[in-house]
Amino acid sequence: MQVILLERVAKLGQMGEVVKVKDGFARNFLLPQGKALRASDANIQAFEARKAELASRNDETRAEAEKIAEKLDGQTFVIIRSASDAGALYGSVTPRDAADVAIAEGFAVERRQVVLTAPIKELGLHEVRVHLHPEVDVTIKLNVARSAEEAELQASGKSIQELAAEEEAAAEFEIAELFDDIGSAGRDEDEAAN
């Protein structure tokens, strides 16, 4: 089906372009969302008449998105989740979680605007793209931790898994020293008895 794009659509084209798309994509997504019109002669003439209005509306929404982008770009948000000792999350962090934490901090972000390239299933710092407008994307960081203290450690550049490994090695060293002390005390008692 031939359609006229009423706004920029990713991987499809710019506003005003006549493109050929599959019928289902046009009927189920582009037409109901108001992103396109069927490319008939009447619609092409109607679009030409409304082109300036659509362009100014697009410029306004892009300007609003750029204002939000200036404040939002590079922000770090903390998400507290339960996780195993190895750092694997019980569940995963979803776009909804990212949007909710951004909204709690006072940013206007919708769930559908958050783009995760892969599911977040581990503790740590993760970069996430936020698609504010067809022409405006920003990157935010999600600091996924078990507690606020862990989040601060991760933010300072320390890995929770490395810290846990160091603590475990220190504990094993203390246990080995304790057994050495017990073993030498037992030998001293045996020598004193002889």
UniProtKB/Swiss-Prot annotation:
Keywords: Ribonucleoprotein, Ribosomal protein, RNA-binding, rRNA-binding. Disulfide bonds: none annotated. This is Large ribosomal subunit protein bL9. PANTHER family: 50S RIBOSOMAL PROTEIN L9. GO terms for cellular component: ribonucleoprotein complex; ribosome. PROSITE patterns: RIBOSOMAL_L9 (PS00651). The keyword Metal-binding does not apply. InterPro entries: Ribosomal_bL9, Ribosomal_bL9/RNase_H1_N, Ribosomal_bL9_bac/chp, Ribosomal_bL9_C, Ribosomal_bL9_C_sf, Ribosomal_bL9_N, Ribosomal_bL9_N_sf. Binds to the 23S rRNA. Belongs to the bacterial ribosomal protein bL9 family. GO terms for biological process: translation. SUPFAM superfamilies: L9 N-domain-like, Ribosomal protein L9 C-domain. Pfam families: Ribosomal_L9_C, Ribosomal_L9_N. One of its GO terms (molecular function) is structural constituent of ribosome.
